[in-house]
Amino acid sequence: MKILVSNDDGVLAPGIKILANELSTLGEVKVVAPDRNRSGASNSLTLTQPLRVKQLDNGYYSVDGTPTDCVHLALTGFLEPIADIVVSGINEGANLGDDVLYSGTVAAAMEGRYLGLPAIAISMVGDNIQHYETAAIIAKQLVIKLSANKLPSQTILNVNVPDLPLNQIRGMQVTRLGTRHSAEPIIKEYDPRGRPIYWVGPPGIEADAGAGTDFFAIKTGHVSITPLHLDMTHYKLFDHLSNLLNEICIEN
């Protein structure tokens, strides 16, 4: 088995090394990841400048681009042969609910799926992560399962793991995305020259975090596994929208 590993925390982040080492027992692992932390990069591609790649002493490839750049590069000509599966992570922090819209970790998995491969995004939930090995072992088990049981097309798995020793994990739950309240206001500061600068505010607190959500699974000590569908079309709205549009008269 050939496995492509990427992330958004950067090629030197502890999570990606632990993940790659664990997955190496299953086959050939190639690591292609950003040269620095690119958290929040979402699905962005670099289109206005070339990408530069450096191979590190440990064999990992460092890319001066986004997580999506890394996976796109790896699967469209940089790596030969291409991988059988993409695993993104282990992210240092949660990717729950609305987080997936901004997450470079999830985006790297999405890019793998866009390019035809099964893909998993895996994140650790906690403030000071101590148990990356737990997530690495869970990722390995999921890769084994997916090698024999293919996911439907247009689908990835978003996996969140409590920062606990493996023997304290209470099980796995298939979940839906919860939601957060709106983000906190921006933070305004001033640089040494007195000019205003702005920081994006913290994420909002949980809004929909009841039973069945990814938030709830984590709170109860379970691994949250949320299947995400890349086709974002809202099919149930078709009839209503068609009726609405029929009422609009377009005249030349």
Swiss-Prot record:
Q: Which domain of life is it from?
A: Bacteria
Binding residues for a divalent metal cation, per the UniProt record?
8-9, 39, 91
PANTHER family in UniProt = 5'-NUCLEOTIDASE SURE, 5'_3'-NUCLEOTIDASE SURE
| Catalytically driven reaction(s) | a ribonucleoside 5'-phosphate + H2O = a ribonucleoside + phosphate
Q: Report the locations given in the UniProt record.
A: Cytoplasm
Q: State how the cofactor is bound.
A: Binds 1 divalent metal cation per subunit.
Q: Which cofactor does it need?
A: a divalent metal cation
For this UniProt entry, the molecular function terms from Gene Ontology, in alphabetical order, are:
3'-nucleotidase activity; 5'-nucleotidase activity; exopolyphosphatase activity; metal ion binding; nucleotide binding
Its name, as the record gives it, is 5'-nucleotidase SurE
The organism's taxonomy opens as: Bacteria, Pseudomonadati, Pseudomonadota, Gammaproteobacteria, Legionellales
Principal cellular location given in the protein's record: cytoplasm
Q: What is its EC number?
A: 3.1.3.5
Instruction: Outline what the protein does.
Output: Nucleotidase that shows phosphatase activity on nucleoside 5'-monophosphates.
Its keywords, alphabetically, are: Cytoplasm, Hydrolase, Metal-binding, Nucleotide-binding
Q: NCBIfam families per the record?
A: PRK00346.1-3, PRK00346.1-4, surE
A Pfam family hit = SurE
- UniProt key word Nucleotide-binding: yes
Q: Determine if Kinase is one of this entry's keywords.
A: no
Q: Which GO terms describe its cellular component?
A: cytoplasm
| EC class (word) | hydrolase
Entries under InterPro entries matching the protein: SurE (IPR030048), SurE-like_Pase/nucleotidase (IPR002828), SurE-like_sf (IPR036523)
Q: Which family does it belong to?
A: Belongs to the SurE nucleotidase family.
